[in-house]
Swiss-Prot record:
It comes from the Archaea. Residues 1-25 are annotated as: Disordered. NCBIfam families: PRK04012.1-1, PRK04012.1-3. Seems to be required for maximal rate of protein biosynthesis. Enhances ribosome dissociation into subunits and stabilizes the binding of the initiator Met-tRNA(I) to 40 S ribosomal subunits. This is Translation initiation factor 1A. It comes from Desulfurococcus amylolyticus (strain DSM 18924 / JCM 16383 / VKM B-2413 / 1221n) (Desulfurococcus kamchatkensis). Residues 17-91 form the S1-like domain. GO terms for molecular function: RNA binding; translation initiation factor activity. CDD domains: S1_IF1A (cd05793). Belongs to the eIF-1A family.
C-alpha cells in the first residue's frame, strides 16, 4: 500500500472521515468568512447572525489557507462571545454534507456569497 504525502491527502481524512460538528456545550459555532483584517484576524458572519472577530491560531495559519467565503468552525472565547478562534475549515464536499444533514441552511451559504 502506498503512503500519501500531506500534499496528496484529502482534508477530510485527518479526522477519519468524520466532519466536526458545532457543539454549543463546547462553545463552537459555524461561521462564514466575510473579510480578512490582517494580522491573522478576520471578520466572520456566524449562524446566529452575529459578526465576530476571529483569530487564526498558529497551528492552522501554516497549514490551512482561509479565504473569504469559506465556511469555518469557530470556538468562542469564554470571556467574550464577540471573539473566537478558528477550530476547523470545511472543504466544499464537507459543506455540501452539512447542508444535506441540515446543520447549515442553504440560505446561509447563498447570503454569504452575496456579502463578498
Amino acid at each position: 500500500m502506498r503512503c500519501l504525502s500531506k500534499k496528496h491527502q484529502k482534508q477530510g481524512d485527518e479526522h477519519g472521515g468524520e466532519i466536526p460538528l458545532p457543539n454549543p456545550d463546547e462553545g463552537t459555532i459555524i461561521c462564514g468568512v466575510v473579510r480578512h483584517l490582517g494580522g491573522d484576524y478576520l471578520i466572520a458572519k456566524c449562524l446566529d447572525g452575529v459578526d465576530r472577530k476571529i483569530r487564526i491560531p498558529g497551528k492552522l495559519r501554516r497549514k490551512v489557507w482561509i479565504t473569504e467565503g469559506d465556511i469555518i468552525l469557530v470556538g468562542l472565547w469564554d470571556f467574550s462571545s464577540e471573539k473566537g478562534e478558528v477550530v476547523y475549515k470545511y472543504g466544499k464536499n464537507e459543506v455540501n454534507k452539512l447542508v444535506e444533514k441540515g446543520v447549515v441552511p442553504k440560505e446561509f451559504i447563498d447570503a454569504l456569497s452575496e456579502l463578498i
